[in-house]
């Protein structure tokens, strides 16, 4: 994976839906991007977290055990029988996930689906570096990346081209960006509208990845549901959003709309001014 956290999240997601306990063990420091409190509160995942002095002796556990280690070299790993998943963090490339034994083979397809729906596996450049490391371990000290410099250049170019001071955000793929936005919106809604249900409004004919991803998020959180938005046939976005927002207002829920405009040619907006009016309209809850 190009990500250090996604392989952990993929296992946590499957175990949440299967009601399986998860133990996350680590021997060094956790990556700064792994915020245990946020993962529990926003994603709804359940797990125990513990640091080990040594990975030589790991006690048994009623559930799945994830062992995290920092490995810049790609060596053969002798997995402890009490470890179900081994995740090796690489400083420049991301992470490598090893699945232990036959008892966990049914996790593989679910983990692969996370790579299709929530993120990417690995960029072509990183994949090439990883293959080189498999052939020659000495290359671990020669991998040079300028990710931060490249990001700065891209962000500056976006501001220059668009003529705005708004902070741009970039991601390795559209779905990974959308996933980050969705979880960020859930976090924001929980902080600013605590204890209120959340409704993601999704066009019924939008791209399969978008629809599937939204439903995968909702499947993990009891207070999040998907509301279908009819936008084709005799329906247009303005009329449909007006009806949907009235319904969500009666539920006193937080509406979040995934629009896909203008990338989806089937989503029609006849009049932008009326769309603005519908989005700005004050609505009344049932109480």
Q: Where are the regions that the model predicts?
A:
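Secondary-structure boundary elements
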Residues: 17-19, 247-252, 277-285
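Conserved N-terminal alpha-helix of the aminotransferase class I/II PLP-enzyme fold
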Residues: 1-199, 203-243
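Glycine/proline-rich, positively charged
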Residues: 234, 238-276
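Catalytic PLP-binding core of fold-type I/II PLP enzymes
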Residues: 65-69, 84-86, 256-258, 268-287
């Amino acid at each position: 994976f190009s990500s250090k956290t996604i392989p952990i999240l993929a296992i946590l997601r499957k175990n949440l839906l299967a009601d399986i306990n998860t133990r996350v063990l680590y021997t060094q420091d956790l990556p700064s991007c792994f915020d245990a409190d946020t993962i529990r509160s926003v994603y709804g995942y359940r797990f125990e977290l513990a640091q080990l002095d040594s990975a030589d002796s790991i006690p048994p556990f009623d559930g799945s055990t994830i062992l995290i280690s920092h490995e810049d070299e790609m060596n053969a790993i002798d997995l402890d029988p009490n470890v179900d998943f081994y995740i090796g963090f690489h400083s420049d490339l991301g992470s490598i996930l090893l699945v232990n034994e036959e008892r966990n083979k049914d996790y593989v397809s679910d983990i692969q689906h996370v790579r299709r729906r929530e993120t990417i596996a690995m960029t072509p450049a990183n994949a090439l570096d990883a293959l080189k490391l498999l052939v020659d371990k000495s290359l671990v000290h020669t991998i040079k990346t300028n990710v931060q410099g490249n990001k700065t250049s891209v962000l500056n170019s976006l501001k220059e081209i668009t003529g705005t001071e708004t902070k741009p955000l970039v991601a390795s793929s559209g779905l990974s960006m959308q996933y980050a936005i969705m979880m960020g919106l859930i976090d924001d809604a929980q902080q600013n509208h605590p204890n209120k249900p959340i409704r993601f409004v999704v066009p019924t004919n939008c791209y399969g990845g978008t629809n599937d991803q939204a439903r995968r998020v909702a499947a993990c959180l009891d207070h999040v549901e998907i509301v279908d938005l009819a936008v084709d046939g005799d329906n247009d976005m303005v009329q449909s959003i007006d009806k949907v927002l009235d319904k969500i207002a009666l539920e006193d829920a937080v509406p979040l709309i995934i629009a896909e405009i203008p990338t989806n040619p089937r989503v029609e907006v006849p009049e932008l001014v009326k769309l603005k009016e519908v989005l700005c309209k004050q609505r009344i809850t049932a109480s």
